[in-house]
Amino acid sequence: MDSNPKTQYGLAKPSISKVPPLPLLTIGQVMMNGAAKYGQMNWRKDPVSSSTYYDAAMRHLMAWWDGQSNDPETGLPHLAHAAANLCILLDAISGPWLMDDRPIAGYTNEFISDNTKKVSTHGDQVPT
């Protein structure tokens, strides 16, 4: 670490330096496409339902998982589309723009915790 006094203050704030830039730029391309189609930051003008963006993100993830790399309409990566939808949800939930229409909370966290195998902390080992 350098000795500049600004560094200490900077390190106390949220950091973006650990996020790789290329995915952010690709998400930006998707967001530009969406702005042209729906209007820039349209979800901040009219509140949006969480299910709309969850469904869209999941459709893009499923298409990617099914072996389709790019969205046929935009030619941009399905993963970037999914990430853009999640970014919109994160932004909308931070303000008054999200209509939270999720179902009543279930037990997903508990199920995952109960069904997660304990593994050693050796980085070169794969859980069995």
Language model regions located:
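Intrinsically disordered, low-complexity regulatory regions
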Residues: 1-128
